[in-house]
Swiss-Prot record:
Record-linked InterPro entries: RsmH, SAM-dep_MeTrfase_MraW_recog, SAM-dependent_MTases_sf
Protein localization: Cytoplasm
Name the record gives this protein: Ribosomal RNA small subunit methyltransferase H
Keywords, in A-Z order: Cytoplasm, Methyltransferase, rRNA processing, S-adenosyl-L-methionine, Transferase
PANTHER family: 12S RRNA N4-METHYLCYTIDINE METHYLTRANSFERASE, S-ADENOSYL-METHYLTRANSFERASE MRAW
Any one of the GO BP annotations: rRNA base methylation
Gene: rsmH
């Protein structure tokens, strides 16, 4: 399955790839952004993804753009280390597309989806990540489960859901996404005028916790800012308010010249778009996943 890149035209317009430029696609996925960048200019792309399953998409791009795409299976918080290892000190742009991809959601064996029964995993990487969702729901205390569901999912029934999870695991270990979704639905009903499944926020929260997504995002932006050439850009596409809040705060710190993740980068950044860029109605119609997407971008002066 191919993951349709969101806000692709808007990303390209801002990044404006140049011949001879060096760009980082920090969330490679199926390579949609990388392909667009490589098509736009005679440039180099260094692509990163922690998901081992994305390697096959890299192979296709490598065939189409020989010697211009370079791929690394790692977390994007390691951008600086990855590039240092290949003697790249500065780049002209870094692009992040945050969150879970369509490919990951559609593959039941990955354990991300509450609509497809599969093993309760949710790890973006089976080699780089530690605790999976199964271990979380079966071993973490009721209080912490409730806190995670509330903090990362904004779920107002977090305590009720946590209690139901603990009650269920006391009888039998929770092993599948279907089991977990059923437990949640047994205590939280779908509201009459709302199409969102009652399991949505809880699954999001557990996924964020398992993959340390918000911590990784902070580190990734800080490292990206540290490797930009003058005129270089960071572009972040996020899909929910927790991610967007981190991007907004990090960009403000950079523009204000504040220390970011122990990196004192000094003054020299400015926002490219004062207002959030959102997908058009046409894009949302053709790709409903784009509905909640928000793009923010920053420039190194």
């Amino acid at each position: 399955m191919y993951h349709t890149p969101v806000l692709l035209k808007e990303m390209l317009d801002i990044l404006s790839p140049q011949n001879g430029g060096i760009y980082v696609d920090a969330t490679f996925g199926s390579g949609g952004y990388s392909r667009a960048i490589l098509n736009s200019a005679d440039c180099q792309v260094y692509a990163i993804d922690q998901d081992e399953y994305t390697y096959t998409f890299y192979e296709k791009l490598s065939h189409d753009f020989p010697n211009r795409i370079h791929f690394f299976i790692n977390k994007f918080s390691k951008i600086q280390q990855i590039l240092n290892n290949v003697q790249i000190k500065k780049v002209d742009g870094v692009v992040f597309d945050i969150g879970v991809s369509s490919m990951q959601l559609e593959d039941a064996s990955r354990g991300f989806s509450f609509s497809k029964n599969g093993p309760l995993d949710m790890r973006m990487s089976t080699s780089l990540s530690g605790v999976d969702a199964r271990m979380f729901v079966n071993t973490v205390s009721e209080v912490e489960i409730a806190n995670v569901i509330y903090q990362y999912g904004g779920e107002k029934y977090s305590r009720k859901i946590a209690r139901a999870i603990v009650n269920a695991r006391n009888k039998n270990m929770i092993n599948t996404t279907g089991e977990l979704a059923s437990i949640i639905r047994s205590v939280v009903s779908r509201s009459k005028n709302h199409s969102i499944d009652p399991a949505t926020r809880t699954f999001q929260a557990i996924r964020i916790w398992v993959n340390k997504e918000l911590e990784e995002l902070e580190k990734g932006i800080a490292c990206a800012a540290n490797i930009l050439n003058q005129g270089g850009k960071i572009i972040v596409i996020s899909f929910h308010s927790l991610e967007d809040r981190i991007v907004k705060v990090m960009f403000k710190l950079l523009c204000d010249g504040k220390s970011v993740n122990l990196l004192n980068l000094g003054l020299g950044f400015q926002l490219i778009n004062k207002k959030i860029i959102r997908p058009t109605a046409e894009e949302i119609h053709s790709n409903p996943r784009a509905r909640s997407a928000k793009l923010r971008a920053i420039l190194k002066l």
